[in-house]
Structures are given as structure tokens and as C-alpha cells.
């Protein structure tokens, strides 16, 4: 048996291989798992809300805390009501006012987005181009504010609800969560507070007046309409007549 070789004390050490950067692969795995869990969780979340009433939204919570911090009444007026129990004028009014291509697009109105970009680029008053689907995605699943991350998530949730919910459910949720006045959300609550009747009894003019204040419900009032709101109401009512109820019958 050959004797073991003994390395001289002054012999140079053999070159050791540097350990592989395990931390990088670990970070990548964590990121991939996080993204996967988010995708799975978001799909489950959206699927559940296809069948369960949306009783509250992050935006409602924000409004409540704002009221508390300002010493005002923090009561939220919101009463979930199926769209089938509302006047047919209610869904038609928001489509006529907010998104007339709603039955046709897949969540995004690219032509309006381009026009809004050109308008804003010229330094004029900021104009939005969000569809009803985008507004629902933002109000139900996200926070308020402007950032690329939020816009990316908004686009993601918009596609999800278009695929999982469908148009009718999206419109139903919008009619229940849209801010329609001070601490007031949805058409049912607006009808009760401003017209002293259920949403099922709203006339065309009343539904159009609620829709007229949607872009800025804290600045304008459906109960005490300004001259602008009255003009806008008349415009929306005309658009509703032109579109006709049949326009949203097959969502």
C-alpha cells in the first residue's frame, strides 16, 4: 500500500473554487414564488367577488378615515342592490356618460387613451380616459393615486374582471361602488338620499343627474344641481335616448 503523500509545510495551497452565488438564486426563487402566489390569490379574489356582493372598497375606507380625521360624520351610505332590481335607466346612464364603448371593448378604450394623452400633452386641463372596467378595477382592488405600479396593477385587474366577471357583473359592481356624493356610494344610496326613492324607481332624468356628478361627486351635487350639472344631465339624457335600452341588453 502506497504511503500517504505529505504536503510540505511551505507548499502553496491549491486554488479553491469560489462558492456559487446562492443568494441570487434564492432571491429569484422568492420573487417567482411571490409573483405566483399573487397571481393565484388575485384570481381567487376576483372569482369570489363575482358571486359575493362588494360591501366595501378601499376607497370607502379612505373616505371614512378622512372624515374621522376632519371631525365629520364618518357614516358611509351604501346599499348593495342587484342591477336587476334597479331601474333600467341606471346602467344606461353610466354607459352613456362614462363609457359608450363599454359593450364592445375588452376593458380598454385605446382611441380615447391616445386622445387624452394628446390633450394632456398640450398642457390643457387633465382629461381621463378610464373605462368603466378600469374604474371598477381601481376602486375595488387598488388604492387611489398615480404611479406606474398602480396603473400596471389596474390593467391586470381590468383584464381579470373582463375575463372572469363579464360585462354585466362589472356594470353591476360599478353601479354599487361608484362614489355618487359625500360619503355616498352607488345608485341605490344616491336614489334614497337625493330623490327619496329606491333605485328601481329612478326616472331617466334622475339617473342621468346622478351620472352627471360621477366625475367629481364631492364638487357637484345630484340633489342640488348647479347649472353645469343640469346641462350635463340634459346631454346624458339625450345620449341615453340615442343609444336606447337595447344597447346594453346583451352584455
Give a label for each model feature.
Residues 2-251:
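Juxtamembrane regions of bacterial inner-membrane/periplasmic proteins
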Amino acid at each position: 500500500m502506497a504511503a500517504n503523500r505529505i504536503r510540505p509545510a511551505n507548499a502553496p495551497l491549491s486554488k479553491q473554487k469560489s462558492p456559487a452565488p446562492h443568494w441570487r438564486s434564492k432571491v429569484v426563487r422568492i420573487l417567482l414564488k411571490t409573483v405566483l402566489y399573487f397571481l393565484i390569490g388575485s384570481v381567487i379574489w376576483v372569482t369570489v367577488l363575482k358571486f359575493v356582493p362588494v360591501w366595501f372598497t378601499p376607497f370607502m375606507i379612505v373616505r371614512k378615515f378622512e372624515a374621522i380625521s376632519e371631525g365629520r360624520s364618518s357614516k358611509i351610505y351604501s346599499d348593495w342592490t342587484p342591477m336587476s332590481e334597479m331601474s333600467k335607466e341606471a346602467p344606461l346612464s353610466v354607459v352613456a356618460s362614462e363609457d359608450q364603448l363599454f359593450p364592445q371593448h375588452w376593458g380598454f378604450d385605446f382611441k380615447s387613451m391616445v386622445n387624452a394623452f394628446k390633450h394632456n400633452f398640450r398642457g390643457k386641463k387633465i382629461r381621463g380616459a378610464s373605462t368603466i372596467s378600469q374604474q371598477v378595477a381601481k376602486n375595488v382592488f387598488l388604492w387611489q393615486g398615480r404611479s406606474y405600479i398602480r396603473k400596471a396593477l389596474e390593467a391586470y385587474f381590468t383584464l381579470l374582471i373582463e375575463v372572469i366577471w363579464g360585462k354585466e357583473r362589472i356594470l353591476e359592481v360599478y353601479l354599487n361602488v361608484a362614489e355618487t356624493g359625500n360619503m355616498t356610494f352607488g345608485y341605490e344610496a344616491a336614489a334614497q338620499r337625493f330623490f327619496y326613492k329606491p333605485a328601481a324607481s329612478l326616472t331617466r332624468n334622475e339617473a342621468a343627474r346622478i351620472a352627471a356628478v360621477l366625475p367629481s361627486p364631492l364638487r357637484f351635487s345630484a340633489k342640488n344641481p348647479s347649472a353645469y350639472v343640469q346641462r350635463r344631465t340634459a346631454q346624458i339624457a339625450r345620449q341615453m335616448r340615442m343609444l336606447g335600452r337595447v344597447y346594453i341588453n346583451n352584455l
